[in-house]
């Protein structure tokens, strides 16, 4: 069973800062994740690679990395 189910409202977490996410379908996941990464880059003054490496997304009691979320949505 996929850890991501649609529609789904959740949050991305980076350095104790929370950003809301809403996944309507698999196609929206990449768009929402990129929006979160860009927002964290501006808010925390970090590089994209650093944000992607440390970003976590809450999914049904589990915390998935950026890479895991993108892979789950594929």
From Swiss-Prot:
This is Putative protein ninY. It comes from Salmonella phage P22 (Bacteriophage P22). The gene is ninY.
């Amino acid at each position: 069973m996929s850890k991501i189910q649609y529609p789904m409202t959740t949050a991305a977490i980076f350095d104790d800062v929370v950003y809301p996410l809403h996944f309507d379908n698999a196609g929206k996941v990449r768009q929402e994740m990129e929006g979160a990464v860009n927002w964290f880059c501006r808010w925390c003054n970090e590089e994209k690679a650093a944000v992607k490496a440390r970003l976590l997304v809450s999914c049904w009691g589990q915390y998935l990395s950026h890479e895991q979320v993108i892979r789950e949505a594929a």
